[in-house]
Regions:
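Mobile late-domain/C-terminal helix-loop "cap" segments
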Residues: 2-101
Length: 101
């Protein structure tokens, strides 16, 4: 989730700052993201996707499939295949900032 948030940041930053305020976890996008990262740790979700899967991942194929997925239409930003690749590679490496579009 943090990687998708970062990729959509340009569109969702203000609403998530408001949500952070209502959740009483801060008042900025960064505060909300920090809360998500802490929650992820609390429930035991690995930081890197590669910690959760053992098989080789065909990143370009997954990115192409993501474009065709009906739920892609609900994303705040309409991603291209290269955007999905960036998000997936960020999730695999655990570097949230590298998901930025």
């Amino acid at each position: 989730m943090p990687y998708v948030l970062q990729a959509n940041r340009s569109v969702i930053e203000a609403p998530l700052a408001s949500l952070a305020h209502h959740l009483e976890v801060g008042s900025t996008y960064e505060d909300f993201l920090a809360w998500v990262l802490a929650l992820r740790d609390e429930v035991g979700i690995p930081h890197r996707l590669t910690e959760a899967i053992s098989e080789t991942v065909d990143v370009p194929a997954i990115a192409r499939a993501a474009i065709l997925d009906p739920s892609a239409a609900t994303n705040p930003i309409q991603f291209k295949a290269m955007d999905y690749e960036r998000v997936l590679r960020a999730a695999m490496s655990g570097v949230v900032d590298s998901a930025a579009i």
